[in-house]
Amino acid sequence: MSFALEETLESDWVAVRPHVFDEREKHKFVFIVAWNEIEGKFAITCHNRTAQRQRSGSREQAGARGGAEAGGAASDGSRGPGSPAGRGRPEATASATLVRSPGPRRSSAWAEGGSPRSTRSLLGDPRLRSPGSKGAESRLRSPVRAKPIPGQKTSEADDAAGAAAAAARPAPREAQVSSVRIVSASGTVSEEIEVLEMVKEDEAPLALSDAEQPPPATELESPAEECSWAGLFSFQDLRAVHQQLCSVNSQLEPCLPVFPEEPSGMWTVLFGGAPEMTEQEIDTLCYQLQVYLGHGLDTCGWKILSQVLFTETDDPEEYYESLSELRQKGYEEVLQRARKRIQELLDKHKNTESMVELLDLYQMEDEAYSSLAEATTELYQYLLQPFRDMRELAMLRRQQIKISMENDYLGPRRIESLQKEDADWQRKAHMAVLSIQDLTVKYFEITAKAQKAVYDRMRADQKKFGKASWAAAAERMEKLQYAVSKETLQMMRAKEICLEQRKHALKEEMQSLRGGTEAIARLDQLEADYYDLQLQLYEVQFEILKCEELLLTAQLESIKRLISEKRDEVVYYDTYESMEAMLEKEEMAASAYLQREELQKLQQKARQLEARRGRVSAKKSYLRNKKEICIAKHNEKIQQRTRIEDEYRTHHTVQLKREKLHDEEERKSAWVSQERQRTLDRLRTFKQRYPGQVILKSTRLRLAHARRKGAASPVLQEDHCDSLPSVLQVEEKTEEVGEGRVKRGPSQTTEPQSLVQLEDTSLTQLEATSLPLSGVTSELPPTISLPLLNNNLEPCSVTINPLPSPLPPTPPPPPPPPPPPPPPPLPVAKDSGPETLEKDLPRKEGNEKRIPKSASAPSAHLFDSSQLVSARKKLRKTAEGLQRRRVSSPMDEVLASLKRGSFHLKKVEQRTLPPFPDEDDSNNILAQIRKGVKLKKVQKDVLRESFTLLPDTDPLTRSIHEALRRIKEASPESEDEEEALPCTDWEN
């Protein structure tokens, strides 16, 4: 029967979840019934005393003060049923005394207004019901007035009462009450029943102790658990509730109290909807309803009763389950029973001693395994069917899309949408195929495991019997070995297919990677996953070869056993009794020839199996070598990556240091420029605020300051005199700017020049002249003071103090001429060889010497000696490189000699080479060109595209190609290099 037909037949059926109405633990519930005169209905309230007690206990642990206050309120003497203390204490949880609410009081859960007449539950204390306490018992039997109970869910009064009960709870022995007296209107005790939880007398202490246990963590953590429920019910509503409860349990049919007749039709308009009842009738009816609800709770359970009374909307998912899940559970139960049956039979082997019993047990095991295989097949066929349908649907839909795209005239948007849909269906088909393969692997795992358990049990039985006794079971053992190898082989081949699919998916993902920040890292991760899959594939293929070898070994053993039986077969010959018997000798010879031919066939088959087993062994060694090579290459790749990372880390550390120094220099230069700008702004502001004010020091103060400076730094001057002919000192006091101006005298005062212009002029002069350090330092004037900036960019004066010399100071030279432009680079054809370079070098040195002295003075103030030395070294290296390049070029020498006219070139006559005897003109490109064949011009765009498609242009593409190459090296090539093993014997 097909699945579609089964769904059609079972469409009108529903599946109810098993154990849907089971309760995890028993709780104590209290029903309170009262009459609402305004609505004319019964107000039914239910309290979960167990949950309230648990909640009050947790609150008691949180705050002991609230418990003490509630205990004080409970001891005020208001122990009546209407008080909160009496309602929350355990003693008040199961009473059944008739009481009535005194006056009108609104209740939010019952009605908008009115005076509810409530029946209170008072627990008869065992001490009160004892013979020595008749007065208290008679006081319980008399109706009393009490306050109404608010019908709110999880009311605060109940919580406070629960806390009071927890604080002032008596001993457990005194609180264990299991029965309640039912009191009639006249005050006589009619019977004793259990109202809250209808348990037996001997079960009451156990139920109470269970109820007083702390709640589980899940219940304490759920703050939304309801402890109270309330509702208004008319007579008709209560009859409908009774019918539903009777459909669950028919024992409740005679338990519903008799309600008065309700007027119907026009009588409801004239006389109202509710019948007229006295207070005594109302109290009696309320109490009977309370007893009925308690009995219904004990008969049907809280879950059904609460759903019937207080639940408005039911979720069908809570009760029903789908038919597919039900059918799957049925298949799983059948499979579980088959497994249990096989396990029972395997356990019987320990007590079996005779071979006859063991053979019977083997036959039963074969039947049990066949039933297990059948149940497993049914289950997995059912599980595979949706994926097969999805695969077929996807293939059909893709075929329709292909036909539509080929035959219909569609626009670009429609074609694009169809292509997206085709890709979606292809993905769904691929996922269905993967699910089918996974389920196939699970199926063969179950069957192979069962077969192996049976085979291992039989091998254990073989040790208990001798060779002669075991000969009867040898054939079954060979069949079992063959079946185990076959099932394991099929399971391993299914695993191999799954791994190949995953490998193919990884390879496609590698090839579809696009450029990005995470592309290289993703490629490395995919390659690592591919390596793990490849190792798993090696293991699976090794197991496949091992199973094939076991199959061949089982066939060889059976063939060898047949050959030995044929050879050991004894033939007895009798004497001839007649002439006809002698004539039958030819037939006997023919039968012997047939036996010999059959023996030869068996031997030939054994040799073939031996050859196949040898090839399997060779393939196993090949796979082992490939696995070792794969592991070695992977380890080498990991080591190389580690080495590259270490090198990169080392280089990166150096680079980080360089970048850090560079950042510090930039930050320092920015700070210097900022301070310089601030200083210039201050100077400009000062000049604008105080124009023409110049403060000059007297001669006496200047001489005293010079003597102090000379006495303070004699050691520093001696050190500088040893290394350089002059000392560059920067004075950081701003007062010496005026002093430097005085030293120059009035004859040397020039027009004021800004600091920026002075600095730019000195820079250009240094770049143009590039004087050597010796010329600069030796030819400086004796004393030159210029207003400059030190490292802190404060106004200061730079003073150059030369060594003590007997020569008098010379007057400053005139201003220098502008620096000459740099010479243009000489062309190669006009170069005159190394002689010209040697002539130019002294001329350049002479020019450098002829540069005026004062031209280098400002640059010497702006740059220190190390920068001048580095500039001079760069000039020397550039000149040496030019000389080396010019000398080392032989073509330059030839051109120079041609220019000088040393020798002349001779025109060479064109000579034709004789063609090769074996070469054709069609294969010679030069011959074709001479004949006038035109070559095809290559387009630049095509050439550019061909170069852009090279794999080495993009690092990601290059990495992908390298990963694919490594994957190809790691993957086994045994399927291409060696022929596949003919394994049709066990594949069929």
Swiss-Prot record:
Bias kind Pro residues: ranges: 803-827
Induction summary: By E2F.
Entry superkingdom: Eukaryota
Keyword Lipid metabolism: no
Segments of skewed composition (Polar residues): 746-755
Extent of the signal sequence: none
Any one of the GO BP annotations: positive regulation of apoptotic process
Region (Disordered): 51-178, 731-755, 800-865, 967-988
Modified positions (Phosphoserine) in chain numbering: 115, 121, 713, 888, 974
InterPro entries linked: JMY/WHAMM (IPR031738), JMY/WHAMM_N (IPR031808), WH2_dom (IPR003124)
The name this protein goes by in its record: Junction-mediating and -regulatory protein
Annotated source species: Homo sapiens (Human)
Gene that encodes the chain: JMY
